[in-house]
UniProtKB/Swiss-Prot annotation:
Compartments, record wording: Secreted
Protein name (Swiss-Prot/TrEMBL): Conotoxin pc16c
Top-level lineage group: Eukaryota
Keyword Secreted: yes
Annotated tissue distribution: Expressed by the venom duct.
Residues the record lists as Aspartic acid 1-amide modifications: 12
Covalent S-S links between cysteines: 2-10, 4-11
Coarse class of the protein's main subcellular location: secreted
Organism field: Conus pictus
Length: 12
């Protein structure tokens, strides 16, 4: 449940 964030690989 992650939005487009550059913290993790959520925003591929």
């Amino acid at each position: 449940s992650c939005s487009c964030q550059k913290h993790f690989s959520c925003c591929d």
